[in-house]
C-alpha cells in the first residue's frame, strides 16, 4: 500500500486538489485536510482533525443544516438527534396476587378499577354509550360461543363408542384385579380426555367463527356507527401544536429495505403538504458492526435525497435494554415530551401520507383515544408461501379485523406497529416492569404490544382499530421456517403475558386478550394431545376385548356403539365453522367486484388452492407450536433473531433437518393406523400425509420462481399487485436503487476508507472527556485489535471500537501510516471489494 498517494486517491477531489495535498506522511496529510489547523497531542489522533473536511467532501448534500458540531473535547460530531428534553417514565410493579387485591378491597383501598377511576364524570358519561354496547355485544359472543360448544360437546359424547359412564363405580373395582380394573377404566379415561379437549378446541374455533361472521356482516352492510374512522371527514386542518414522531425501531435488519420503505413513506407524507407536522426517528438496536456502518451511510443518503435535515434523525443505542420496548421507552424519556403523538413503524412497514395524516386527525377528533391501530395489508413478496399468505390475510383478514372491532370497540388490540399512540399517557402509564420471579416466564416482557394496550386502557384511554383506514402496509416472512422462527418468540411472549391475567385494574377485555394470546399457541399441543388420545382409543378398541359388564350382577352388556350419522353431522358442522369464514370472504369479494383479485374464476381457484395449502401446513404448525410451548415451559432459550425480510428459498438440507422428525412421525403414524384399522387412517389422512410431505412443501413453497409463476397466472392476486399504490411502487424502486449501492463489510471500510471512517468517527456516541485511565483502555483496545487478525476480532470488540471516535481515528491512522506492521489487516482489506456504486451516487 503506497500510503499517502493511495489515501489521496480515495478522496472525492479533483486532480488539482489532490496534487496540492502533501504526500510525505499521514500526519501532514491530515493536518492539511484540517481546516481549523488544530495540532493534536498524539500523532495518531490527527485524523480527528480531518473528519469535518472528509465529511463535507463526500456528504455535503446531507450536511446543509447545523448537523456538524463539536463535542466537549473539540472533536467533530454529527448531531444525528435533536437535543433531549427528559421525562420520567417509571413502571408500576405488577400485582398478580388476587388474594392481596381482595384484601385491599375489604379495607376500602380500591373503590373503582383503575381504568374507571382515572376518568372524570363527564368523560365517563361521554364513553358510557359505546362501552355499554361493547359489553352487551361481548355477552352475546360469550353466549353464542358457549351454547354452540355445549351442543357440539353433547353430540361428541353421544358418538363416542363406550357409553357405560354411569355404570362405573370405583368402589366395586377395589376388590378385583388391578389389570381388569385398568382395562375397564382405560377407554373411559381416554374418552373423558378427548371430550374435554374437544370442548376447549371447539370453543376456540367457535369464537373465531362468530368474529368472522360479524365482520362479514359489518363489511357487507358498509355502515358502522361506532367506527372511529367515521369521526372525521379527512380534510380537517392539523393543529400545528400537536406534532407527530414517526419512530422506527430496528435491529440488524435489511438496511436497503428499511430505508427504501422509509423514503417512500416520507415522500408520501411530503406529497400531502403536511410534513411540517412530522419528524422521523430511526432507532437502531443493531449489534452487527457491518450493519451499523451501513445504516449510517443509508441515513446520510436518505437525508440528501429527500432534503430531510432537521426532520429525519438516527440513533444507535449502545446498551440494548429491554429490546424493542426499551428502545421505544428510551425515545419517550428523551424526546417524547416534544410530541403529542408517535406512530410506531416496523422495519418492513410502509404507510401512505394520507393514512398517517388520517391517524393524526382521528387522534385529534377523539381526545380519549390512547392508541389507534391501523389494519396493515401484507404485500411485496414473491415466494409461493408468501404470496399464498398475502392472499389469505388480504382476503380473510378484513373480516376478522372488522369482527374484532365489532366485539371490542374501544377496548381493542395493539399490534406493535403501524399504529398511532398518544405520547403523554403512554409515558405515564405504559412503562413495563419486569415480571417478578425466576425462570423462563420472568424478567423483561417479550411481547410488549398487548401489554401496553392493556395498560393504556387501564388508565382510562381508548384503544381502537381503524379497520377501514387504507394505506397501511407490511411484509410477511418469505417461507414457512422463517415464519416459525417468528412464531417461536411470539409464543414465548404470549405465554409470559398470561402471568398478567390477574393483574390489578386490567379491563376484562384485555384479560381475554391475554387468554386468546395464550390459546393461539396452546391450542397446538391441545390439538396434538386430542389426536394422540384419539389414536390411543383406537388402539385400545382394536387390540383389547371390550368390557361388556362393568358392575357385579349386571343383567345386560354395554355394547360399544358407532353412530356414523352423528359423527358425519358433527364433522360437517366443525368444517363449516372452520371454512365458512373463508367462503364468506370470497362472497364479499364477489359482491364488491373480484377484478382486483384476478376475476371470479381465479379468485375462486385461489381460494381452493389456499384451503389445500392451509390443510397441508396446519399439522406442521401444530407440531412446531407444540415444541415451542414445551420448550418455553422447560426454560429453553429463545433467540430473538430478526426475521428474514426478503424473498429467500429454503435449502433441502435445512428442510429435512427441520421437518425430518415430522416426516418420520407421519410415516410411523400412517403405517401403524393402516395395520390397526384402515378406516381410521382415512380420518387421519390429512394429518399424517401433511407431515410426510412437510419438507417437500416447505422447500417448494419457499421458491420465488414458483410464486412468480402463479403471479403471471393471476393466482393469489391481491389489489396491491393488480394496481400497486404509489408508495409501494416507490418502495420497490428505491429498494432496487439501494441494492445497487449497498455496503458490505462496513466495519472494515470504516477502519480503512477515508469517507466511511469520517462518518463512523463523527457518528460514534462514546463522547468522553479526557481521562488517563480511558486513554490506557483505548490504547489497549486498539493494540489488541490490530495485533490480531481481523477474523479474530469478535462482534463485541468491534462494537466497542465503533462506539468511540478516538479508537476509530487511531485505528484508521495506524493501518495507513504503518501498513507493514499491520499487514494482516491490510491484506484482508485488499481482498474486500467496495461496491463502486456505494459512493458514486453521493
UniProtKB/Swiss-Prot annotation:
This is Glucans biosynthesis glucosyltransferase H. Its main location: membrane. GO terms for molecular function: hexosyltransferase activity. The keyword Transferase applies. It is an enzyme of class 2 (transferase). The chain crosses the membrane at residues 140-160, 194-214, 513-533, 570-590, 615-635, 656-676, 680-700. Belongs to the glycosyltransferase 2 family. OpgH subfamily.
Amino acid at each position: 500500500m503506497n500510503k499517502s498517494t493511495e489515501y489521496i486517491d480515495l478522496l472525492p477531489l479533483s486532480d488539482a486538489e489532490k496534487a496540492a495535498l502533501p504526500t510525505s506522511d499521514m500526519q501532514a496529510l491530515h493536518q492539511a485536510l484540517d481546516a481549523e489547523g488544530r495540532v493534536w497531542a498524539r500523532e495518531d489522533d490527527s485524523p480527528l482533525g480531518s473528519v469535518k473536511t472528509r465529511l463535507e467532501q463526500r456528504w455535503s448534500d446531507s450536511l446543509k443544516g447545523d448537523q456538524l458540531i463539536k463535542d466537549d473535547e473539540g472533536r467533530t460530531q454529527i448531531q444525528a438527534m435533536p437535543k433531549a428534553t427528559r421525562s420520567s417514565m417509571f413502571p408500576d410493579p405488577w400485582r398478580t396476587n388476587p388474594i392481596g387485591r381482595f384484601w385491599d378491597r375489604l379495607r376500602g383501598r380500591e373503590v373503582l378499577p383503575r381504568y374507571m377511576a382515572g376518568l372524570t364524570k363527564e368523560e365517563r358519561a361521554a364513553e358510557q354509550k359505546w362501552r355499554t354496547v361493547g359489553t352487551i355485544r361481548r355477552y352475546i359472543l360469550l353466549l353464542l360461543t358457549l351454547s354452540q360448544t355445549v351442543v357440539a360437546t353433547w353430540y361428541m359424547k353421544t358418538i363416542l363408542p363406550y357409553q357405560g359412564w354411569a355404570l362405573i363405580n370405583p368402589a366395586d373395582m377395589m376388590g378385583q384385579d388391578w389389570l381388569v380394573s385398568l382395562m375397564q377404566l382405560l377407554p373411559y379415561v381416554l374418552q373423558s380426555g378427548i371430550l374435554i379437549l374437544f370442548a376447549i378446541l371447539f370453543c376456540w374455533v367457535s369464537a373465531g367463527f362468530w368474529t368472522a361472521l360479524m365482520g362479514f356482516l359489518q363489511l357487507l352492510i358498509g355502515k358502522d356507527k361506532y367506527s372511529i374512522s367515521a369521526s372525521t371527514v379527512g380534510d380537517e386542518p392539523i393543529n400545528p401544536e400537536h406534532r407527530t414522531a414517526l419512530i422506527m425501531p430496528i435491529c440488524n435488519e435489511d438496511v436497503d429495505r428499511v430505508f427504501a420503505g422509509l423514503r417512500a413513506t416520507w415522500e408520501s407524507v411530503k406529497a400531502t403538504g403536511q410534513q411540517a407536522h412530522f419528524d422521523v426517528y430511526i432507532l437502531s438496536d443493531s449489534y452487527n458492526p457491518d450493519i451499523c456502518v451501513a445504516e449510517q451511510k443509508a441515513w446520510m443518503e436518505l437525508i440528501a435525497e429527500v432534503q430531510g435535515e432537521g426532520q429525519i434523525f438516527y440513533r444507535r443505542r449502545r446498551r440494548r435494554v429491554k429490546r424493542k420496548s426499551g428502545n421505544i421507552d428510551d425515545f419517550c424519556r428523551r424526546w417524547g415530551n416534544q410530541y403529542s403523538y408517535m406512530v410506531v413503524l416496523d422495519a418492513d412497514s410502509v404507510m401512505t401520507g394520507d393514512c398517517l395524516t388520517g391517524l393524526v386527525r382521528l387522534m385529534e377528533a377523539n381526545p380519549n383515544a390512547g392508541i389507534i391501530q391501523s389494519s396493515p395489508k401484507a404485500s411485496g413478496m414473491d415466494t409461493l408461501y408468501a404470496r399464498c399468505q398475502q392472499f389469505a390475510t388480504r382476503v380473510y383478514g378484513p373480516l376478522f379485523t372488522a369482527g374484532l372491532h365489532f366485539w371490542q370497540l374501544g377496548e381493542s388490540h395493539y399490534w406493535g406497529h403501524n399504529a398511532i399512540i398518544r405520547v403523554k399517557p403512554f409515558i405515564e402509564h405504559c412503562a413495563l416492569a419486569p415480571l417478578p420471579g425466576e425462570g423462563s416466564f420472568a424478567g423483561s416482557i417479550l411481547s410488549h404490544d398487548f401489554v401496553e394496550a392493556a395498560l393504556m386502557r387501564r388508565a382510562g384511554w381508548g384503544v381502537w382499530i381503524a379497520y377501514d383506514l387504507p394505506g397501511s402496509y407490511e411484509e410477511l416472512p418469505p417461507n414457512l421456517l422463517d415464519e416459525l422462527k417468528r412464531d417461536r418468540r411470539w409464543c414465548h411472549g404470549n405465554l409470559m403475558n398470561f402471568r398478567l391475567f390477574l393483574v390489578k385494574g386490567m379491563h376484562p377485555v384485555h384479560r381475554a386478550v391475554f387468554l386468546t394470546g395464550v390459546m393461539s399457541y396452546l391450542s397446538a399441543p391441545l390439538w396434538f394431545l386430542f389426536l394422540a388420545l384419539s389414536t390411543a382409543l383406537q388402539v385400545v378398541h382394536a387390540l383389547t376385548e371390550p368390557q361388556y359388564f362393568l358392575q357385579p350382577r349386571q343383567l345386560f352388556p354395554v355394547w360399544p356403539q358407532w353412530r356414523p350419522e352423528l359423527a358425519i353431522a358433527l364433522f360437517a358442522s366443525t368444517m363449516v365453522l372452520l371454512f365458512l369464514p373463508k367462503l364468506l370472504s370470497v362472497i364479499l369479494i364477489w359482491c364488491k367486484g373480484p377484478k382486483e383479485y384476478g376475476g371470479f374464476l381465479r379468485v375462486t381457484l385461489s381460494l381452493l388452492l389456499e384451503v389445500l395449502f392451509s390443510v397441508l401446513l396446519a399439522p406442521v404448525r401444530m407440531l412446531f407450536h407444540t415444541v415451542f410451548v414445551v420448550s418455553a415451559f422447560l426454560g429453553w432459550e429463545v433467540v430473538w433473531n430478526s426475521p428474514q425480510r426478503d424473498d429467500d428459498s429454503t435449502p433441502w438440507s435445512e428442510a429435512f433437518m427441520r421437518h425430518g422428525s415430522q416426516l418420520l412421525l407421519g410415516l410411523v403414524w400412517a403405517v401403524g393406523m393402516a395395520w390397526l384399522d384402515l378406516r381410521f387412517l382415512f380420518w387421519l389422512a390429512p394429518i399424517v400425509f401433511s407431515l410426510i410431505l412437510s419438507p417437500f412443501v416447505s422447500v417448494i413453497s419457499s421458491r420465488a420462481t414458483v410464486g412468480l409463476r402463479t403471479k403471471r397466472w393471476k393466482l393469489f392476486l391481491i389489489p396491491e399487485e393488480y394496481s400497486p399504490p404509489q408508495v409501494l411502487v416507490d418502495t420497490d424502486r428505491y429498494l432496487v436503487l439501494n441494492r445497487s449501492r449497498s455496503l458490505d463489510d462496513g466495519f472494515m471500510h470504516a477502519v480503512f476508507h477515508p469517507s466511511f471512517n469520517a462518518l463512523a468517527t463523527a457518528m460514534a456516541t462514546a463522547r468522553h472527556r479526557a481521562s488517563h485511565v480511558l486513554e490506557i483502555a483505548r490504547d489497549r483496545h486498539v493494540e489488541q485489535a490490530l495485533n490480531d487478525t481481523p477474523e479474530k476480532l469478535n462482534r463485541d470488540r468491534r462494537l466497542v471500537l465503533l462506539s468511540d471516535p478516538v479508537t476509530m481515528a487511531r485505528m484508521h491512522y495506524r493501518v495507513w501510516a504503518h501498513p507493514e506492521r499491520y499487514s494482516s489487516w491490510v491484506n484482508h482489506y485488499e481482498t474486500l471489494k467496495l461496491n463502486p456504486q456505494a459512493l458514486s451516487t453521493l
